[in-house]
Amino acid sequence: MRRLNRKNNEALKKLNDRQRKVLYCIVREYIENKKPVSSQRVLEVSNIEFSSATIRNDMKKLEYLGYIYQPHTSAGRIPTDKGLRFYYEEMLKISKETSEADLAVETFKSVPLADPEKILFLAGNLLARLTQGYVLIERPNTRDLKILRVMLIPVSEDYLIFSILTEFGVSRVTPIKTQERLNWEEIERQLNFLLRGRTIGEVLMGKIESLKGSGFLRLIESLIGETVERYLDAGLENLLKDETLTLEDIRNLLEEVKDQKFLESLVGEGITVRIGREIGRKNLEKFAVFSGRYFKGESPIGSVYFFTSKVTRYDRNHKIFEYILNRLSEYFTSTSRR
């Protein structure tokens, strides 16, 4: 990724301010209207005070440098992946230089603090709706969660409920049939003494000697072994409505995101954006993907991705994505400190 940025920066040094404005205008117009952009159109929608011939010469240079291309003779120009990357980088600069625009986004205030699944569901649907993209959110790994409390609740002479409550409000519950009359309150107290503050992973790895081989360890293993989808998704219908994508494009995407290693390869430091060929899969060259992590304190606990057509509003989408990641990190950090 750094090599790509270095090459782009070297190419940008060959452009003067006017040519950068022309390129910016072409990309913005194409994103808005999804039609090739002519030199005349550049003059109509910009404040560039030069002749159409000058703009055409600039467009030839931009084409030579790989920022735009002409689909056929006498047509306007269309941005390449490199041109879209330029637009995205320019948007980042503008965002840093100006005060952040107010985003019409909902907050998480109405969602109970003890319901992380609802928080992730809300975040995914909000991100999909505002970006018109397809969203994948990785759930926190259950094995990394700290145990807050264990409960043994008798419900009849023969049955009791075994419950584990972890940070973020994630709980696992199972009924137990028992024929023994034991002091369940004392057993619950001892279990809490042993388990509270430990991660589920530590327990399952046998780090608590007194639990090794016990029925309770087997119960915990069976509870955590319950199948939970690693990712929740939202917004597939947005891609189906996008006129720049075909059903085949969408099928290709759905097939590729099944590959866990592929998804992990998309994540870098901070927010990473890959456009077209930068994704590294030929059958995904019509897409752009934004990826990033959300945190508990300083520790990353999950990744978020959203895929959209590469002809998209990079400026707005970057702000929205950053907002969602920050809110998720705030939520999981504050919940873990309760």
UniProtKB/Swiss-Prot annotation:
InterPro entries: GAF-like_dom_sf (IPR029016), HrcA (IPR002571), HrcA_C (IPR021153), WH-like_DNA-bd_sf (IPR036388), WH_DNA-bd_sf (IPR036390), WHTH_transcript_rep_HrcA_IDD (IPR023120). One of its GO terms (biological process) is negative regulation of DNA-templated transcription. The keyword Repressor applies. The keyword Transmembrane does not apply. Keywords: Repressor, Stress response, Transcription, Transcription regulation. GO terms for molecular function: DNA binding. Pfam families: HrcA. SUPFAM superfamilies: GAF domain-like (SSF55781), Winged helix' DNA-binding domain (SSF46785). Negative regulator of class I heat shock genes (grpE-dnaK-dnaJ and groELS operons). Prevents heat-shock induction of these operons. Belongs to the HrcA family. PANTHER family: HEAT-INDUCIBLE TRANSCRIPTION REPRESSOR HRCA. This is Heat-inducible transcription repressor HrcA. It comes from Thermotoga sp. (strain RQ2).
